[in-house]
Amino acid sequence: MNMTGGGAGPQAGPNSSCNIPNSSLLATAPVAATMPIAQLADGWLELESDPGLFTLLLEDFGCHDVQVEEVYDLQKPIESPYGFIFLFRWIEERRARRKIVETTAEIFVKDEEAISSIFFAQQVVPNSCATHALLSVLLNCNENNLQLGDTLSRLKAHTKGMSPENKGLAIGNTPELACAHNSHAMPQARRRLERTGAGVSSCRFTGEAFHFVSFVPINGQLFELDGLKPYPMNHGGWEDHEDWTDKFRRVMTERLGIATGEQDIRFNLMAVVPDRRIAITHKLKMLRTNQAIVSGTLQKLLKADEQGEGGNGDPQRPDTPSTLLEPSAFTARDLQSLLKNLDTEIAINEQHLADENDRRHKFKVDASRRTHNYDKFICTFLSMLAHQGVLGELVSQHLLPSKKISGQSAANRLNKQSNATANAGATAAGAAGAAPKSQQQQAAAAKNGKSPSKTPGRRRKGRNKCKKRK
C-alpha cells in the first residue's frame, strides 16, 4: 500500500536555526557547501509510504544494519523489531480524531526531565514526518544493538538535552538528512511544493494528508512519538511474561477500532527490524561449520571401519573437536543423515539470502523509476510523433474508435426507429385509402337496388353454374 506521507508542521522561517546551538546544525558536513542552511527547512518534500524507500533512506542516513518491512497481520509474530511506524490519514476536524485526542491527552508525558531523557522531536519542518518517524525509532534504541553511523550518532550527541522544538529544527537543518530525504521523492512532489510555495504542505490545507508516528519501547514502557503532538505519549508497560510487541498489538487494535469508525481503512503499518541478511549470513556460517565437522568425522569413521576390516587391530578413534561426534555416539548412517539435513538447511538459507538480495536490488530499481523525471522523454517522444505526422492518426486509432462505435450504434438505432415509423405510416395510409373505395362500391350497389352484402364475384360464379346446367 503506497500512500504519500506529507505531514505538515509549523513553517520554519529562514532564521529559525538561531535558536539552536551552532554545533547541532552539523554545518561542517560537505553537503552544506552546496545547500544553504537557511533553505534546508523550506525544501523538504513528501515521501511515499513504502518499505523499500524507507530501507534505502536508512542506508543513506548511514545505518546499514536495519531494514523496514510492511506489516499485514498484527497477530503474526515479528522477530526482534526495533519499533513500528504507523501511517494514517490526518483530518483534524473529523470525529475520530477528537476521540483519539481525548484518549491520548491522559497519557501525555509532561515532565521535562523525562522528555529530555528520550529523543522526542517536534515536527517544525513541513513534509519531514517520514524522517522524523525513522529517527524516533533509531535514536531511542540501544547503541550496543544498533550501529547508527556517523551522521545519526553525531545528531544524537548534539541534540542531547535539547527541547523537542530545537530537536526538530536540528533535524530540518541537517544537510545529510535533507538531501537523503529529498533524493527519494517523486518529481510530482517537487512540482507541488513549487506551486504551493516553499515550506507549505499542500495537502495539510486541503484537509487531506497522511502522517507518520512511531511506537518504540523505552525503559520498559511503550511510547508513542508524534511530532505534531506537544508531548510524547506513554502507553504503559507490559506483563512480565509478555513481549513489548504484545502491548503494541493491544494499543494498535484499539487505535484502529477508533480510526476506522467512519469506514476509513487507509492506513499503513511498518516495522523497523534488523537486516535479515545479517542473521541469514550468520546462520549460514554456523551451518557450514557444522557441515565441515560432520563431513570430517564421517570420513574418519569410514576410514577407521576400513582399517578394522583389514585386520589391523582396533580402529583408531578419530580426533574430533566435539565429543558429540565421536564414533561411539553416532554411526556412519547417522552422520550421513545429519549431513544430508545440513545440506538441505544450507540450500534453503542460501535461497533466502538470494531472495533478500533480490529484494534489495528491486528496492533500488523501484527507487530509480520513482525518482526519475519522465516529462522530458514523454514530451520529446510526442513531439517527434507530431513532426512525423503520425500523432493524429495514433490518437484517432486509440481514442476515437470507442466514440465511433457508440456513434454508429446510435445512428443504427435512429435508422431502425425511422424505418419502423415509415412502415407504420405506410400501413396506416394504405388502410385509409382502402376504406373510401369499399364505401363507394357499397353506395353504387345500393343505387342499383342490389344487396350490398353480396359481392359481384359470387354472382358471376352462380351464373356460370346455371349456364352449365342448361
From Swiss-Prot:
Subcellular location: Nucleus
Enzyme class: hydrolase
Bias type Low complexity, positions: 422-451
Active-site feature positions: C129, H211
Biased composition (Basic residues): 456-470
One annotated GO molecular function: chromatin binding
Site residues, Transition state stabilizer: Q123
Highest taxon, organism lineage: Eukaryota
Ranges of residues in domain UCH catalytic: 43-274
Quaternary structure note: Catalytic component of the polycomb repressive deubiquitinase (PR-DUB) complex, at least composed of caly/calypso, Asx and sba (MBD5/6 homolog). The PR-DUB complex associates with nucleosomes to mediate deubiquitination of histone H2AK118ub1 substrates; the association requires the positively charged C-terminal tail of caly, probably due to direct binding of DNA. Interacts (via ULD domain) with Asx (via DEUBAD domain); the interaction produces a stable heterodimer with a composite binding site for ubiquitin.
The protein's name: Ubiquitin carboxyl-terminal hydrolase calypso
Origin species: Drosophila ananassae
Lineage, highest ranks first: Eukaryota, Metazoa, Ecdysozoa, Arthropoda, Hexapoda
